[in-house]
């Protein structure tokens, strides 16, 4: 069978389709349970052609999270601009969307997924990932009207990811946590994060 010649525009479209498929699958079923085969089949291409875009699954994961960042920021901006919501309600809803990413289409890595990805990233790729992560959380603080100092960004990153990771970890990764209280635990953490952001706004 003759090979199909793809233009640059075609390749960009296929690449975008791959990232969109990856994001949808990873948000719904997790990074670890999303296979390369599921992604290239969803985009309608072959396995061989897939690897001309992303040499490894880890390359795809990183690019998928980069693709997601503007969408996450846009979601926060839309909530802050919603006249029907108070500031606190908007922050709460945003954090809920992140913690329950399988419902809202936001991909979040579990502890194990983070560990596996970190082991396979080069030092340079890890630095780039952290820089983009910092930029995202800085943008979110700015969107929430909170001074985006380095200290604020670092704290907000950790407390937000803690809530997301804990929610994903109960009960499989954290079997001694009480699964019946998982949702109440997430709600408590979200309120605590909102309290912290209010203090940052009030006392810059």
List each language-model region with its residue ranges:
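C-terminal peripheral helix-coil segments that are non-catalytic and often amphipathic
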Residues: 1-2, 135-146, 162-204
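Basic, helix-initiating cap at the start of DNA-binding domains
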Residues: 1-29, 38, 42
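Hydrophobic alpha-helical connector segments
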Residues: 63, 77-104, 156-157
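Solvent-exposed, amphipathic alpha-helical segments
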Residues: 17, 21-28, 71-79, 159, ...
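Amphipathic alpha-helical packing segments from all-alpha helical-bundle domains
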Residues: 70-77, 119-146, 151-158, 180, ...
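Hydrophobic/aromatic residues within well-ordered alpha-helical segments
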Residues: 14, 57, 64, 68, ...
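Amphipathic alpha-helical segments used for helix-helix packing
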Residues: 89, 99-124, 138, 168-176
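Helix-turn-helix
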Residues: 25-59, 63
